[in-house]
């Protein structure tokens, strides 16, 4: 890969990991438009590391408080808000882990097509618009319940379908349950930590078994640009989402889906 390709792909990973706009669709475009080949397992690991570091550093205070609270109070009857939130992240992650483990091979073989990605980009974009337009959006993250965390975790399973957008579907579920936009985004980003970590570990295991040649400079640049773009994305999204709402992202998803459909049927 050239340095230009590394930078573009790393930025795509960093931004689309957290915005509700589907990473699958964006990673498909360079291949369709420019004929870029697959970036390889090592690069995939590197950009996941960059995204993971970004979200963990941004939420370092919350993660520290949740970890301490969970270790000291996790199995007691009296639990603080931080301890409960830690449990909710764990509970919300379990459905995607189980279904992902069972269905990963089938999904990769049958669902990772341009037509599927285009369809899910449009359909779940419209669902995001409906949730944002009709939901009450009154509840803070501190008021999240176990039942709500389970529902959001079950919704996250749909993100295994390429084009859905993990952040998009979890925010959609949160909005439908009455959470404020920023609360939906914060819980979605916290849920991303074990998901990105798991995806990175799986890619690492695949890399070790593949015995693939490693370009360390490409990995360093990939991780760095993924980190910077992801961190800025998280910061700006949380700063603006309460004011701008989800409509700009919905419009963008519809446009992206239309472009992908054009590639399919052209």
Curated annotation (Swiss-Prot):
Listed EC numbers: 3.6.1.27
Superkingdom, natural source: Bacteria
Subcellular location(s) per record: Cell inner membrane
Root EC class: hydrolase
Annotated membrane topology: Multi-pass membrane protein
Chief localisation class: membrane
Biological process, per Gene Ontology: cell wall organization; peptidoglycan biosynthetic process; regulation of cell shape; response to antibiotic
Additional information: Bacitracin is thought to be involved in the inhibition of peptidoglycan synthesis by sequestering undecaprenyl diphosphate, thereby reducing the pool of lipid carrier available.
Protein family according to the UniProt entry: Belongs to the UppP family.
The protein's name in its UniProt record: Undecaprenyl-diphosphatase
Organism encoding this protein: Alteromonas mediterranea (strain DSM 17117 / CIP 110805 / LMG 28347 / Deep ecotype)
Gene coding for it: uppP
